[in-house]
């Protein structure tokens, strides 16, 4: 054992010595697998040699090596110089066009003024002109500008067009005289005009303006667009005089495309300084410049000066009136409301609607009656605009004016619109006049008053609504009276007290028709404290009252009436009442879709046991599929033996089986 440990220690020490020796050797003489030294990075010459045959195929290692080589040296002056020299030489070699294009892409990153002569000479050769221009156009400074200007004079065909475009992109101001001379050459006029617009400046703008009048019709829009660009540049440089000259040349020309002329008209107003108001008013007088002029009104005329514009309203086209009304919506109401009001009588639907919308923004109390009148007369979009505007008017004074107008008993159509506004605006102080409107001889007014009460009323208003429902209203009022009673009752926080007023009225009521209507309210309010009252009424001596009570329990919207409808279904001898009770029971069972299926089916079986007619069994079968389980299948199969409901039973079996199969798959 001792000898074994000693040997192990020896080998451990020896292993450490060998490992150290290997590390030292590796540092002193790095080797790779097989004893070969690692390959040295490829030189640029090697990379370009490999790239020279590249034709766009998959094998693109040289492409990426060139990219990495250039990127590694683009911030080093000596490295850039090497890359520039060798890539320029490569551009004149027999390399493939694809390879030269790739090289040119990298040349534009590192090339400087020293590369310009070589690139300029390449521009003279159609075979290399595109690649040379690709690199040259990205070299900043006057040397490259000069080369391109010289090339513009000597190049031909597509190369010349490309050089002109490049000078425009570079915004080479010194090229303007040469480019301007080409505006009269059909083959070059378009690109020359575009280039001058991109260069901008007063000289370029003047050159374009000088050629505009004599330009062919097809070229005029191009020159005009470039003149606009020059004018915008001048405006940005605070040279309003130069900009104005260009705009004044273009704005009177009706032959220009509408967007171009509109821009010229707007620009002329913008560049006119203190004279902008007069220019704008002049443009308002011309139908073809109205739209552009209106778009600048808010920039030129303040609240104290807007009256100058309002005098033009009658002279504007309908389209112009609509646009001006939209602009006036942002002005103080006391300055513009009279002019807006006048347009409410326009024969144009569009103008009237625009006026209504504007009144919603700028109107005050004085706009209440005109808007209510408009809403009462109009239909469709115009009526909707009037109602929206009446609801949008701002301020308590508007609310007070609406109440005042209602108190003056206006025509029924107007009163209806004012009552609608009371509800929309939630004018709670209007409740006295709204309550008074419940006494109106007009059914339309009464209905709108009921709707307004739903928004502003309180449970204390229920007695007045019940008076209308039971004593004064006609059939057209009753549906809204019921809805209003329910809406007011729902505002009572204690759910078990919501039907108190109705129950009190019912207890003292002797008239059958009134009792029936009151009973019909109870399931709509759904206060479960009313169920004992209904149970008692189900045994009343008045058959109509009994029928109403049974129907109320059968229609009860919550499970609180479950046992009541079970008792009805079991005990009643009236077939109609049994059908109603079974239908109510089935509906109540179906209210809880997440109930245990077995328990729900047990209740449905009770309903089936009470059923003696096919109509009643069909109600049960219709609900079975909501609770898929074995018990549901058993009940459906039992009813399958009944010929009168066989089809319904089979449909229930199919639905239950399908749902059970899905549940098995999910599990």
Q: Can you say where each PLM-predicted feature lies in the sequence?
A:
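N-terminal "cap/leader" segments of large eukaryotic alpha-helical scaffolds
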Residues: 37-57
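N-terminal secretory signal peptides that target proteins for export/translocation
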Residues: 1-11
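Basic/polar N-terminal segments that are highly enriched at the extreme N-terminus
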Residues: 29-38
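Structural detector for internal amphipathic alpha-helices that build alpha-solenoid repeat scaffolds
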Residues: 37-38, 56-78, 89, 93, ...
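Alpha-helical repeat scaffolds
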Residues: 242-249, 278-281, 309, 402-406, ...
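Charged (often Lys/Glu-rich) extended helix/loop segments that serve as interaction or gating elements
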Residues: 642
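Bacterial N-terminal signal peptides
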Residues: 14-30
